Amino acid sequence: SISCGESCVYIPCTVTALVGCTCKDKVCYLN
């Protein structure tokens, strides 16, 4: 998995979610 550089501890992935990133272990990851 590639880290998208966005945290999702308090809020879900926002900008990175648009490119397909999902929350895993409090960090947004691609795939």
UniProtKB/Swiss-Prot annotation:
GO BP, sorted A to Z: defense response
InterPro entries (alphabetical): Cyclotide, Cyclotide_bracelet_CS, Cyclotide_sf
The keyword Protease appears for this protein: no
Key words of the record: Disulfide bond, Knottin, Plant defense
Post-translational modification: This is a cyclic peptide.
Cysteine disulfide partners in this protein: C4-C21, C8-C23, C13-C28
Top-rank taxon, per record: Eukaryota
Pfam family name, one: Cyclotide
Keyword hit for Nucleotide-binding: no
Cross-link type Cyclopeptide (Ser-Asn), residue numbers: S1-N31
Family the entry assigns: Belongs to the cyclotide family. Bracelet subfamily.
Record comment regarding domains: The presence of a 'disulfide through disulfide knot' structurally defines this protein as a knottin.
Job of this protein: Probably participates in a plant defense mechanism.
The protein's name: Cyclotide Hyfl-A
Species name: Hybanthus floribundus (Greenviolet)
